[in-house]
Amino acid sequence: MYFDGYKDISILDITFDSGKAKGLSALLVRNRAFECVVVKDHALDIAHASFGGVGVSFISRNGLSYQKDTFPKSFEGGLLYTCGLDNVSNCVNGVYTHGTLHDTPAENVRYDVVDGTVYVSGYIATTGLFRHSLILHRKLCISCDGVTVIDRIENTRKVDADYCLLYHCNFGAPFLSDGGEVKVDYLTREGLTPLAKETQATASNIIFPIPNAEEVVYYHTVKDGRAEYVNRRLGIGVEITYDSDKLPYLLEWKSMAEDDYALGLESATTRFDTFRKTPINAKDTHEYIVNIKFNRFQVL
C-alpha cells in the first residue's frame, strides 16, 4: 500500500510462499532510508532491516521459519527478537529457550502513516488454562532512521503474576565488520563465560570473522540506558536507548564466528545467572520503550 503525499513510504502486506517460511505473514515497510520486515506471526518482531541500502540486521543461516524446531534450528536473529515472557536464555527448565513470546502470532494488527511515521500495532496474548494471562500490546513507530518500540504488558487476571523480558537486537554484515566498535558508557562490565572473562578488555572491538570462534556474552550496567555500535568505514551507526531503571541489564552477545557473525545488544529485566522475574500486580500494566535509531556520519 502506498500513501498519498508520501511517495517514499510504503507498506506491503505479504505472505511467504516457499521454503521453511511458507505461510508466515509479514509487513514489508519502507520509510525513505529505512526498510524492514515486521513479522506478524512472530509477535511483530523485526527480521530483515536495511538503512540507506545497507543491510544492518543479523539473519542466521536458519532464516525465517513458520514451524518451530529446537532453538538452534529455529533462531533467525533479526533486528528485533523479543525474549520472554516466560523465559530468557535457559533459565526456566522445560520452557523454550528465550521464551515463547517471539513465536506467538500478533492479533488485531493495524498499520497507518501519520506525519511521515509508519505505525504498526497489535497485541500478543500469552495465556494458559489455570495459569497467567499476560497481554503484550505493541506499537512500532517506524521512521526514516529506525524504529521505536512501545510495549505495554497487561495482567488481565485478578491475581498477581510475573514475567521476564529481553530485547534481543541483532546486527550483522555488512554493517557488522572488522574495525567496528561497541560504545557503552558502563558502570560495570562482566564476562559471562570463561572466555568472556578473559576478553573483557576487548569487548568493544569487532574483528574479522574467524572459523569456529566461540561466542561470548558480557553483562553491562549502564549509566544512561544507551548502547551504540558504529562502523566508521561505512559511516553508519546505531544507537539503542531505553529506560535503565526498568531494563537494568545490558547484554552484549558477540559471535565472531565466520558463519555466525553477529552482534547482539540486549536490554533486559534480569541477568541469566541471577535470574529473577518481574512481579506485576493483578490488573496492572507495565510499559517499556526501546528506540533503535540509525545515523550517518563522515566516512573515515
Question: What are these model-derived regions, one by one?
Answer:
Residues 1-148, 159-164, 171-208, 220-300:
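Surface-exposed acidic/polar loop and edge beta-strand patches at domain peripheries
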Residues 212-216:
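C-terminal beta-strand-rich structural cap/linker in extracellular carbohydrate-active enzymes
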